[in-house]
């Protein structure tokens, strides 16, 4: 006889699997067919009749038998209902198959709303995309003493073409980073790619018997569930009293529409139960990418499986020269990069969209205005991937980037990132700016794949004495939002830096020195002046 504890676990697993058949397979909400305007309304499928085809033996017997009348009962059409299709609520059906939905039906969820699904003492796995790192990393999730937490880093194929970097080198880098930056000790930081199937075995090995996946919308939780189901299929009894076959549990609903999941969804994967939670938003109640971008552009951004490896291998760049007029670079109007005058820059873009340069931001916004005003698509419509409200400068935030040497990556939360590099002999000529829609967080980082690779090699060569992350300089930083009228951006940045670090004086490096002496000439190691990120 099985121990009582194992019987209880099996009983709970059966209950969790049963939930999948009374809930919407896309969003997880409980289905009902009484109130058409209520949450979870669906139309029950009609029973379909399928005629069984006669087998070849029956046909032969019919052709060559002398007693045809005796075959009537044997050859009568046998009718049987078809297997039930996955059930889906009207809200998800309209959005997925008819592309009709309202923002109110796909609202954001606060962290408190998501946590109501998680019992105390549960095993939580914080899913954070490497493309957005560290913007979606939430220290409150990892350090919550009520739960056992670990870090899973998704979408690794969009930062490196080398899966061995995720398997062998990334764990040590993130282990040292969490300890150094957040004072958090963990040996369970796994980087993976669900769409490519990279490192899925390692993810499964760190999952506990009953695990909860938590993260922001479209962080890759549901895609991970499907990758796990594919590699570790779980069998369950078929529906019906006479069913004897087994079928694989249906996968998680994956969509390019943000906030598709709105209730807990549990999956029996191998010998473990994985619970997929709705995505939470730290800026709950504030505008997000869906309030600024066109639906088609947002769809391309969310379809991460379409990302091509050749982008990372070839790294094709666009040259951008800064001018006194404020020449800018954009990708479908999602953001506007304004370099300092007389600088030559290379931009390697990893965000889906069409690249274009304008004389200045005012000219770019006038194109947005004219294209939305035109009833028919104009010649520049392909470069406008934002909603009509984004024709106004008031709907943008001016982010000033701290000084940098060499290459950096500019990260836009829930959108993606691009690489920026100044070329030629180094000379400080001013600060770069990135204008983005309100509600979109921005940060910069040294190229993360290079950080992981160089950090791991340094860790190995020192036999573990040297950490896999630089200790003497900051490699991640928030940006500095400023008013449109601010002209002395370097001085304003210093003031904002001092305010941000008033409770972290150890982060105040080079404060007593003249900033122009520090960033005026190239340094052997980038000083990264005014770089600071609040973990």
From Swiss-Prot:
Instruction: Please give the chief subcellular localization of this protein.
Output: mitochondrion
InterPro entries (UniProt xref): G_CP_dom (IPR030378), GTP-bd (IPR006073), Mito_lipid_metab_GTPase (IPR050896), P-loop_NTPase (IPR027417)
Q: Does the keyword Phosphoprotein apply?
A: no
Its subcellular locations are: Mitochondrion
The keyword Mitochondrion is assigned to this record = yes
Transit peptide per record: 1-38
Tell me which Pfam families the record gives. Answer: MMR_HSR1 (PF01926)
One Gene Ontology molecular-function label: GTP binding
Cited PANTHER family: GENETIC INTERACTOR OF PROHIBITINS 3, MITOCHONDRIAL (PTHR46434:SF1)
- Biological role: May be involved in the mitochondrial lipid metabolism.
Q: In its UniProt entry, what is this protein called? A: Genetic interactor of prohibitins 3, mitochondrial
Q: Report the source organism.
A: Lachancea thermotolerans (strain ATCC 56472 / CBS 6340 / NRRL Y-8284) (Yeast)
By which gene is this protein encoded? GEP3
